[in-house]
């Protein structure tokens, strides 16, 4: 029997958190090896573990996978969270990319210079309420089903619900006009494996604060 997947990243959200969410939702236990200093990253680079000299990296099924989308695709396929045919996978990809676009803006927000934060937050709010959330609300409204694609839980639902938690952290009022998305969030959050991941003490990471940013700066030298 194969061992648990091992996740190599720093002890924060960043680009690994969507991978943690997907594994947790699939009910897969995983281990984490945190990169705590530049030497830890250098060791992974020097031993050939990082194809493109960067993390996230996940050891799974005898492979050392890098590139977030490749990792997510593999996990989603392995654990049957990627639709039943090509058309469903195309929709799942399209929705997941939309989630990633807004998620990227939110992920970079804590790195904003203080003078730019208000303008950035205004932009995120505008994109959230006028572009991204209405699009996903309309998908659910158009077919009246419980999940985005094929009336079955997929990676798109998991990525979207993760994003909704981040939106709520920024400003809970942003979800007010999207009842179907709030219902999806509640539905996915009540899946036993996800419910467990949302409990205190799980491997879910807290919001990024100044301390985490400084830790990441030291490791990744940005």
Curated annotation (Swiss-Prot):
Residues with PTM N6-succinyllysine: 4
Xref: PROSITE patterns: GST_CTER (PS50405), GST_NTER (PS50404)
Record PTM N-acetylalanine, positions in chain: 2
Subcellular location: Cytoplasm
UniProt binding sites for glutathione: 9, 45, 54-55, 67-68
Record's subunit section: Homodimer or heterodimer of GSTA1 and GSTA2.
Function field: Glutathione S-transferase that catalyzes the nucleophilic attack of the sulfur atom of glutathione on the electrophilic groups of a wide range of exogenous and endogenous compounds. Involved in the formation of glutathione conjugates of both prostaglandin A2 (PGA2) and prostaglandin J2 (PGJ2). It also catalyzes the isomerization of D5-androstene-3,17-dione (AD) into D4-androstene-3,17-dione and may therefore play an important role in hormone biosynthesis.
Protein name in the entry: Glutathione S-transferase A1
Protein source organism: Bos taurus (Bovine)
Lineage, opening ranks: Eukaryota, Metazoa, Chordata, Craniata, Vertebrata
